Every structure is written in structure tokens, then in C-alpha cells.
Regions:
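Active-site microenvironment of metallo-dependent hydrolases
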Residues: 1-41, 45-46, 102-104, 289-305, ...
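Divalent metal-coordination and catalytic microenvironments
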Residues: 28, 48, 73, 84, ...
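Histidine/acidic residue-rich metal-binding segments in metalloenzymes
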Residues: 124, 159-179, 185-251, 257-279, ...
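Structural motif
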Residues: 22-24, 66-67, 107-109, 137-140, ...
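Active-site neighborhood of phospho(di)ester-bond hydrolases with catalytic His/Asp-centered motifs
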Residues: 77-84, 111-114, 142, 178, ...
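Divalent-metal coordination cores built from histidine and acidic residues
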Residues: 2-15, 19, 98-206, 269, ...
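Short, ordered loop/turn segments at secondary-structure junctions
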Residues: 55, 113-116, 144-146, 182, ...
Length: 590
């Protein structure tokens, strides 16, 4: 696939120098991600495309361009391409997201709108598509493949089969199938998943993968099934095995999970890094504003010892190859003119950002205009929760008094989203299971989608909170109302706060509502601009810390993967506790 110029014949003339180019960037050190070289060059741009790169005699033909941009000796690198991103996880609309990431040098993102798809179905994906039109960046869309993530083990607000995939495939800027996270369905050749893959193969679009800890013959089967990328690679051995087997590894640095160091440790001894890319996956507004976006991920890789040019190539050229766009991600004739001027290859703070040859950001500030628009979905209520009482949050035991053995989920590490199954012997009082210490909490996953009234209850150990109730409708991927709590009374108050505002996050301690982060769009997204949202997010983080989450860099997102039944080994859903690898529900009592 190629991004086509609007007038190829005119571009040819600009390349030959027989007509003026729109712009030339001169006095730069060009970072050539194809050869690995750095050298002085002039880059001529015509109609959003690179027409000519002059490196033999830079400075000689500047008169052949209408505008001359002095790079002041800076490095000129391609615009960054995020290999895998859920814009909803920034809690911003696509337009506000663009305002946040463009000054950081991100000119293209491959976005998977499966968060909003799980809540609003086709209407949600169309919203993400329509609201990202006409932006000074490229938001390319992968069609959500697993809505819900694992059918039969959770209830979402929609279900995508081949019919829905086919309908979305005709949208402009759709380039592939989003992360095929039901990896067992691929490995086992299940009809629902394979029908979707077969359809996308016929369309000639790429298949994005999701294969945590998948290894050996299971990995071979997954690759033979079609998906060829993975952003869920979490350790060094896994990274090396996947790249050796021809898989693209999208090393992730999100607000939740950071895997770049482990991935690089695994592959630093190989000769070719062509199958290594970078992604942010889930990065919230506060981090984007104060830390950065993909430029921060590349900085991290360099700090772990990766060669800067190789790291930049992984964030540009390699990613374009992964998504099958031939003329994106490098600075060469016929390529799209997405470029950054940076003072340092280690710091990667763009002095200027060009998108399609147009200056869109300068010195950390957006200079392109992004018009504010409103859409009907932004006013739609998605909280269809039945009337709740304290009784809904009590775990009723099979005995009135005594003890019972409970199947529970356990976190071994505050920094990891993976969990283990454990069996706890807990006391029973008045027919209800009691907690014995502050490492234990109750969990409720309350279905919030129209037509359901299911509530999954369980026990979690090592979640990190020591008191109170933490509630969120940001709860991958079905985004049901998930609550971790110490008492049913606190849980009810936290739930009511979110039902009242249309969704978001809330924290309650000793019956007092500490803070509510309102996310009225699908219970996932704020309508506030990035700076306002970041301030609100900081208040929510402080509320989380007041409940005991003090040892996490970003406590806001601790809860969001607790109900994601594709991350091993056990997770909760509105139907109960799920054995991820066996794809079956686990009884509450052992």
C-alpha cells in the first residue's frame, strides 16, 4: 500500500527541478533510517511529498523552492509512528489527543478503537473515525477484532462478527485488523475468529497480534493463523523468540505497563532490528503532557543502550513496514513529508514538526489549527446499571457461620497486570464472606450495558489498596463497572457516583467520596482539553494513593486490567472469575 500524491506528474517535475518545490529544509543533518547514515542534506517537499533529497551539493539549489526553512544544523528525522494505540485510553477525544501528541513528534498512530466498540458498537468506531478527520496528523484505524474479548466469559455492549468487520472495512483510513487478543481462538482454529481473519486476508489488510507468553508450537500456530505482531511481549526470552520467528514485536511503554527494557535486553545481541517497533498502547493525558508520547518511548530505549538511529528507525521505518505502507517512515523521494527537527538524538524534543510538509508544531506548541467539533455520541448515556443496593456487594456463603474456601485472584507485583489463582480460607459471619486483613479486598464487576443485569463477585489479594472503594468504568475490554472495595457500603457509594455522571473513576474512604474523574463519553473519555483533564487526573491519583496505592508511579490505571480475560492467568468478569488459559469460569467456592 502507498499513500498517493494528489498530482504525481507535478511531483515528478518538482523532483526534476523543472517546477518549484513548495519548501526546502536546508542546513540539517539528515538521519537516514534506511542506511543508518547521518549526513548534511537539503530536503525538497512538494504537495506533502518528498520530491528530492540533495546530499551531494547541499545549499546549491535552494532557489528551486518557494520557501526555505533553515534547520540551523539540527537533525532531521522522520515523524514518529505509534504501532499500537488506544486513543480512548488517553481519556481524550481524537481531536484533543491530536493536540497533545503532535508537539511530541507523533505524526501517525495506528489506533484500535476497541474500547469504545465494546461499549457503543459500530456507532463508537464510526465516532472515532469521523472525529479524527481533517487533523494535522494521521490516525489510521485497525478494526476491533475481539468484541467482546472472549465471548461467553463476559458480556459487553456489542459483538463484532464478520458482518460488522465487513461494514467497517470500507471506511477510509482503515488499514488492518486490530489486536487479535483471543489467541487461543486462532491457535485452535475456532470458526468465529478464523472467519474474521479469512475476510481480512481477502481484503489484503494486515493482522495485528496480541500473544502474551505464547511460545513454541503455539506461537507457530498463531503466526500461521495470520497475526504477525505483538505488543504484549513482556520478557527478554519471549522477545527474542518472537523476532526469530518473524514476528514484529512492538515494545510497549504505556501508563500501565513498561516492557521496553526487557524487550531490548532480549534482542540487543541480534544483527537486524527490522522487526522491532515501539508503541504506547495505553498512555493517559497527564503522561503525554508532562513526559511525552512516542518520543519518550524511544528515549527510554536509547537510555537502555539502544543505538539512537536504530531506535528512531524502529519508531518510524520499521513500523511503516509492519503496517504495509511502503512510502511512510523515511526521508527519501516519494515518501510522505512527515519530519521532525531535533537538537539531540537522545532527548528527541522536536523544535519543529512537519506533517505532509506543513509546519504543525514548534518548540512544544501546536501551531496548526484543530477545530473543536461536537458529535451526538458525546451526549449519549451508556450507564444502564440496574438499581443497586448494599446486598449486591455482599458475597453470600453456603454456610451461615464458620469458614469457607474461596477461589481468589492474586497479584504478585504492583507493576504487573498478570494474576494467579489462589485458594483462601475465609471466615463467614451472618452468611457473608469476611475479609481478614488489608491485603484482601472484595471485587465486583457490574454489567453496565443495556439488556444485562449481571454482577460478578470475588476476592482479590495484593491489589494494593488498603482501605476504601475504588470504582471505574474504564475496565478493559468490556468496560463494565468494576469496583475493588473493603465494605459493601463504600462500594455502593462509589458506584452511585459513576452512575450519576455517566462513568469514569471514583474513590471512597470511610463513606466519604474523595474524588470523581468524570468520563461521560462512553464512560471512557472526557470532553475536557488535555491540560484540564491532566489536572483532574492528578486529583484522582491522589485519591487512589489515599486508599493505599502509594507505591505505584501511576495508581490511576491499576484497576483497568483487573477484568481483562485475555491477560493470564485469572481475571474477573461480570460472570465471575475467569481462567484465561482454559477459557472457562472458575467457581467462587473451592
Amino acid at each position: 500500500m502507498k499513500i498517493q500524491p494528489s498530482n504525481k506528474r507535478a511531483l515528478l517535475k518538482a523532483a526534476l527541478g523543472t517546477i518549484e518545490s513548495d519548501m526546502v529544509i536546508t542546513n540539517v543533518q539528515l538521519v537516514n533510517v534506511i542506511t543508518g547514515e547521518i549526513y548534511p542534506a537539503d530536503v525538497f517537499v512538494y504537495d506533502g511529498m518528498i520530491a528530492h533529497v540533495e546530499y551531494k551539493e547541499p545549499g546549491k539549489e535552494l532557489s528551486k523552492a518557494k520557501q526555505v526553512v533553515d534547520g540551523e544544523g539540527r537533525y532531521l528525522i522522520p515523524g514518529f509512528i505509534d504501532a499500537h494505540e488506544h486513543i480512548e485510553s488517553s481519556m481524550m477525544t481524537p481531536r484533543n489527543f491530536a493536540k497533545g501528541v503532535i508537539p511530541n513528534g507523533t505524526t501517525t498512530v495506528i489506533t484500535d478503537p476497541h474500547e469504545i466498540a465494546n461499549v457503543c458498537g459500530l456507532e463508537g468506531v464510526r465516532y472515532m473515525h469521523e472525529s479524527s478527520e481533517g487533523l494535522p496528523m494521521r490516525q489510521l484505524i485497525d478494526i476491533p477484532s475481539c468484541v467482546p474479548a472472549v465471548p461467553g466469559l463476559e458480556n459487553a455492549g456489542a459483538e463484532f462478527l464478520v458482518k460488522e468487520i465487513e461494514e467497517l472495512s470500507s471506511l477510509e483510513r482503515v488499514i488492518g485488523l486490530a489486536e487479535v487478543m483471543d489467541f487461543l481462538a486462532v491457535i485452535n482454529g475456532e470458526d468465529r475468529m478464523m472467519d474474521i481473519i479469512d475476510f481480512m486476508d481477502k481484503k489484503g489488510l494486515y493482522l495485528q497480534g496480541h500473544a502474551p507468553y505464547v511460545s513454541g508450537r503455539m506461537l507457530s500456530a498463531y503466526l500461521c493463523g495470520g497475526p504477525n505482531t505483538c505488543h504484549e511481549t513482556r520478557d527478554s526470552d519471549e522477545a527474542l523468540e518472537k523476532i526469530r520467528n518473524g514476528m514484529f514485536v512492538d515494545a510497549r511503554d504505556s501508563s500501565i505497563t513498561k516492557n521496553v527494557k526487557e524487550v531490548y535486553e532480549g534482542v540487543k545481541g541480534i544483527k537486524f532490528f527490522d522487526h522491532l517497533c515501539f508503541c504506547t498502547d495505553d498512555r493517559e493525558a497527564d503522561d503525554i503532557l508532562h513526559v511525552g508520547h512516542l518520543n519518550d518511548v524511544v528515549r527510554a530505549a536509547i537510555s537502555y543502550g539502544m543505538d539512537p538511529v536504530t531506535a528512531i528507525k524502529s519508531a518510524t521505518y520499521n513500523t511503516a513496514r509492519e503496517i504495509h505502507i511502503e512510502n511512510l517512515g523515511a526521508i527519501a523521494p516519494g515518501y510522505v513529508a512527515d519530519m521532525l527537527l531535533v537538537d539531540s538524538l537522545e532527548e528527541l524534543k522536536p523544535a519543529k514538526v512537519f506533517f505532509g510538509g506543513q509546519l504543525v508544531a514548534e518548540n512544544g506548541q501546536l501551531v496548526a489549527e484543530i477545530e473543536d467539533r461536537s458529535y451526538p455520541l458525546e451526549q449519549k448515556n451508556t450507564m444502564f446499571v440496574k438499581e443497586l443496593t448494599v446486598e449486591d456487594f455482599k458475597i453470600k456463603a453456603p454456610v451461615q457461620e464458620g469458614t469457607v474456601k474461596v477461589n481468589a485472584m492474586e497479584y504478585k507485583d504492583l507493576l504487573l497486570s498478570s494474576t494467579l489463582q489462589t485458594v483462601l480460607e475465609l471466615p463467614v459471619k451472618d452468611g457473608c464472606v469476611q475479609l481478614t486483613d488489608d491485603t484482601l479486598k472484595y471485587v465486583a464487576v457490574v454489567n453496565r450495558h443495556e439488556g444485562y443485569d449481571t454482577i460478578g463477585l470475588g476476592i482479590v489479594k495484593g491489589f494494593g489498596t488498603t482501605c476504601g472503594a475504588l470504582a471505574s468504568t474504564v475496565s478493559h475490554d468490556s468496560h463494565n463497572l468494576t469496583i475493588v472495595y473493603d465494605t459493601p457500603e463504600n462500594a455502593l457509594k462509589a458506584a452511585h457516583a459513576l452512575i450519576a455522571c455517566g462513568g469514569g473513576m471514583s474513590a471512597v474512604k470511610d463513606g466519604e467520596l474523595l474524588h470523581v474523574l468524570e468520563l461521560p463519553l462512553a464512560g471512557l473519555i472526557s470532553l475536557k482539553p488535555a491540560k484540564e483533564l491532566a489536572k483532574d487526573s492528578q486529583k484522582m491519583k491522589e485519591a487512589n494513593r489515599a486508599l493505599g496505592l502509594v507505591d505505584m508511579e501511576n495508581p490511576l490505571l491499576r484497576i483497568v486490567t483487573l477484568a481483562l480475560p485475555v491477560i493470564p492467568n485469572v481475571k474477573m468478569s461480570d460472570l465471575g472469575m475467569v481462567d484465561v488459559l482454559k477459557k472457562e469460569l472458575i467457581p467462587l467456592f473451592a
